[in-house]
A protein has these predicted regions:
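Polybasic/polar functional segments that serve as interface/processing modules
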Residues: 1-35, 47-81, 95-97, 103-115
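Catalytic metal-binding acidic patch
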Residues: 37-39
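Short hydrophobic/aromatic beta-strand micro-patches
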Residues: 41-43
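Active-site beta-strand termini and strand-to-loop segments that position acidic
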Residues: 83-85
Length: 115
């Protein structure tokens, strides 16, 4: 069974918490016309932490629904990893990079999904 949409975003958030990702935020971009239906933005402390978070999300989603990201951009050395599931983009960012780019503010008109 393949999972998508908000369920996929929530699954990614749950998987990221297994590796202690910080400050997870799901943004619903459907009403604001973003590049995907949902963003998940999470933070990590260092390069190994970012790599572990992204790997756990990839593993968790594959186990739950057999789905792999269409593309993985960036790497832990760039301090920003994007897992592209089509309808969900997962941004795994170093805390400093996240504070610099402030994606949540850029997409400030998007609804936040807390549960």
């Amino acid at each position: 069974m393949s999972v998508g949409g908000v369920e996929l975003a929530r699954l990614c958030r749950e998987s990221s918490s297994e590796k202690k990702a910080k400050d997870p935020v799901i943004l619903d971009l459907r009403k604001v016309g973003g590049p995907a239906d949902f963003f998940l933005v999470v933070s990590g402390d260092n390069e190994p932490h970012l790599k572990a978070i992204a790997g756990e999300i990839d593993r968790g989603v594959e186990e739950a629904g057999g789905r792999k990201p269409y593309r993985i951009s960036g790497n832990s050395a760039s301090q920003w990893i994007i897992l592209d599931y089509g309808d969900v983009l997962v941004h795994v960012m170093h805390s400093a990079r996240r504070n610099f780019y402030r994606l949540e503010n850029l997409w400030g008109d998007a609804d936040r999904i807390d549960k």
